[in-house]
Amino acid sequence: MLTNNEIYQEVQKFAKGYDLNQDGVLTSQEIYYSLLKKMNGNSYEASKATGVLCSTIDINKDGKFSYHEIAKYCADNAKKLIEQNADIAALADVEAFLLRFDKDKDRKLNKTEFVEYFKGGTDTPYSDRDYVLKIIDLDKDGCVSANELQEWFKKKRIDYASRPHC
């Protein structure tokens, strides 16, 4: 995931193509004329696209977009998308996990079922299953529910997405 500074740098590069007077601020008029040119003179589409941008990115509603406003919008939306995708992927992770390890099909893993996760070459970075059970078992009832698993998988995915990967 890009840092806020990297997002700002990318936005600056992108926005310069729309900033007709190169003052570091985009007006709705500059955006419209830039889009009109990029859309081969289609004024309807350029107007529609300008309206969408103005209504979503112009945080303080002054009719102008600073590079900072655009970068903040991009960073905020990137974070939301990561969280949404992590939530959806975690749900799939939970279903696969329960299908494999929930022997009594009660949508919870008791300690015996949970121990199966650590057997048979299952790839896990954790060696202390009691410690992991304590982390995941949020309500401390000795079982791991589907909701607890989903929260854990979601957190792992968000943590992973937040680290550099090169």
Swiss-Prot record:
GO terms, molecular function: actin binding; calcium ion binding
Record-annotated EF-hand domain positions: 6-41, 57-80, 89-124, 130-159
Ligand binding (Ca(2+) 1): D19, N21, D23, E30
PROSITE patterns recorded: EF_HAND_1, EF_HAND_2
Claim: S-adenosyl-L-methionine is one of the keywords in the record: no
Originating species: Dictyostelium discoideum (Social amoeba)
The protein's assembly and partners: Interacts with the actin cytoskeleton.
Gene Ontology, cellular component aspect: cell cortex; cytoskeleton; cytosol
Protein name (record): Calcium-binding protein C
Gene Ontology BP annotations: locomotion
Gene designation per UniProt: cbpC
Residues noted as binding Ca(2+) 3 in the record, renumbered to the chain: D137, D139, D141, C143, E148
Subcellular location: Cytoplasm, Cytoskeleton
Lineage: Eukaryota, Amoebozoa, Evosea, Eumycetozoa, Dictyostelia
InterPro entries: EF-hand-dom_pair, EF_Hand_1_Ca_BS, EF_hand_dom
Function: Plays a role during cell aggregation and slug migration.
Record-listed Ca(2+) 2 binding positions: D102, D104, D106, K108, E113
Swiss-Prot/TrEMBL keywords: Calcium, Cytoplasm, Cytoskeleton, Metal-binding, Repeat
